[in-house]
Design a protein with these regions (language model features):
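Phosphate/nucleotide-binding beta-alpha loop and adjacent structural elements of enzyme active sites
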Residues: 1-46, 51-358
Length: 358
């Protein structure tokens, strides 16, 4: 077994053995998924509460949605099961306050149905590859994130995430060096938020920005927010390892995806073909589960230009080892860092790759 895995029971076993009523915090898709999985594991909820501003006497899945104070008055002691995702500072503070008073679980569920998830069997199956990536990561903080996140995904205790979080802007400025002639490729540009982040990192000076976004509503927002910037190429397309058409599900949010999509056909592009002979110095990649295909479609530019890269590492559990393995295959000289930024559950994890050759 892996020495850095200290947990032995999974989150569902921990819920069962805690001996406390299980109360969900949150409604919506996340709560649906948690309740379904609890039922499959033979677990039942004792109630549901929401933040006070969202309690309006409604029912959810047969439960009256209560205030936290109502739950406390009704139950002497209970465990809280966080059933929604957030990166908002005030919500994370609320999670931490609950954890100071109660046993708190934040179950990790795969983003995409049918994908592999972290279990004891998964850890045993991939132990060699996980250990190899762990050993090769660039610093101790990366290894701490790697270990903490895997322990969290197994046991469901969010404290593991809070103990290894760092600030995104500080990580970008400390691990990357940005000049005044950067050529930036933003894959999964959303509404332009990461273009604005790039402008802050470079003081507004750059050579070119290429921003790619497949979701129609997000693309319209991107165009509006980037209007007026010079040397910017906006591309409405998905990112893949070949030029083709793919099924795509629009959401108008961050979770627009190629995976299990049934809504419409979109143009998908191989970035080596889009860029042709154009150099790129910095790549941000958050393409909702298509990171492996996106990297494969950038082989030429990664091998020739060795750009610094910021790559989402949370869409699939197997991304934890498959993405760095692929990066090292394309460029063995990459130093790869792993950072966890503010979010519950284990989203906003990113590999940060820097070329360290001669």
């Amino acid at each position: 077994m892996l020495d850095f895995i200290t947990e032995t029971n999974n989150v569902w076993q921990n819920m069962r053995s805690c001996g406390l009523p299980l109360v969900l915090y949150g409604m919506g898709n996340g709560a649906d998924a948690v309740l379904d999985r609890m039922a499959a594991e033979g677990l039942t909820a004792a109630g549901i509460f929401a933040s006070d501003e969202f309690v309006r006497g409604q029912n959810f899945r047969g439960f009256k949605v209560e205030h936290y104070s109502d739950i406390k008055a009704r139950l002497e002691n209970f465990a809280v099961v966080i059933a929604f995702a957030s990166e908002l500072p005030e919500v994370i503070s609320r999670f931490k306050a609950l954890a100071a008073e109660h046993t708190v679980f934040a179950p990790h569920l795969p983003l995409y149905a049918g994908s592999e998830e972290v279990t004891n069997a998964w850890l045993e199956k991939y132990a060699g590859r996980l250990q190899n990536v762990y050993n090769k990561l660039a610093d101790e903080q990366s290894r701490k994130v790697f270990a903490n996140v895997l322990n969290y995904k197994l046991c469901g205790r969010p404290e593991y995430l809070w103990q290894c979080e760092t600030d995104r802007t500080e990580d970008l400025t400390q691990l990357f060096t940005f000049g005044k002639e950067e050529s930036y490729l933003d894959l999964g540009a959303y509404d332009g938020d990461t273009v604005r982040e790039f402008l802050q990192l470079t003081g507004g000076s750059y050579k070119k920005i290429t921003a790619v976004e497949a979701d129609r509503r997000n693309y319209r927002k991107l165009c509006a927010k980037i209007e007026g910037l010079k040397n910017v190429q906006l591309v409405e397309a998905a990112v893949w390892d070949e030029d083709t058409e793919l099924d795509f599900s629009d959401s108008g949010g961050r979770q627009s995806t190629l995976i299990n999509a049934h809504k419409r056909k979109v143009r998908a592009l191989k970035m080596d073909n889009l860029l042709q002979n154009e150099a790129v110095t910095y790549i941000k990649m958050d393409v909702e589960g298509a990171e492996k295909q996106a990297l494969s479609g950038l082989k030429q530019h990664i091998r020739s230009g060795r750009p610094k890269m910021f790559i989402a590492a949370y869409h699939y559990d197997n991304d934890f080892f498959e993405l760095p393995e692929l990066l090292w295959q394309l460029c063995p000289e990459y130093k790869i860092y792993l950072r966890k930024h503010r979010y519950v559950p284990a989203w906003e994890m990113n590999f940060m790759a820097v070329y360290q050759g001669t």
